[in-house]
Amino acid sequence: MKIGALAKALGCTVETIRYYEQQGLIPPPKRTSGNFRQYNEEHLQRLSFICNCRNLDISLSEIKSLLNLENASKQQAEEINRVLDKHIKEVATRIHELAHLRMKLIELREKTVSNDEDPMKLLLQHSGVKFVRLK
């Protein structure tokens, strides 16, 4: 399979695949007589795993560690779970922060609707911007 077909199958770019190859996340593919990269099923599966991990916001260095644990023993499975637990905590933190942001936005919207003041002034006041009177 050529790189364009692989990229299309994965829903990523050719540049992304080349980058992952440069970073050592996938083995270099064989080359055709015309010097084109020729990818196989192993590349497809490995890149699919990498893309799924990236969608979960797992860093490339962590993905590399996970790929090195391919034939996971019990100890290695614990390492995989450690990485996943870290990301679960990070996602929970982000969810909490986003929920807080959502509430602040709702409050601000309600104030702009129910207040006779200039909506832009209200927005700036709630953004933490300090007003200074110029003489």
Swiss-Prot record:
Annotated DNA-binding residue span(s): 4-23
Keywords, alphabetical: DNA-binding, Transcription, Transcription regulation
Molecular function (Gene Ontology), one example: DNA-binding transcription factor activity
SMART domains, alphabetized: HTH_MERR
Keyword DNA-binding on entry: yes
PANTHER family, sorted: HTH-TYPE TRANSCRIPTIONAL REGULATOR ZNTR, REDOX-CYCLING DRUG-SENSING TRANSCRIPTIONAL ACTIVATOR SOXR
Function of the molecule: Transcriptional regulator.
Protein name (Swiss-Prot/TrEMBL): HTH-type transcriptional regulator ZntR homolog
Species this protein is from: Haemophilus influenzae (strain ATCC 51907 / DSM 11121 / KW20 / Rd)
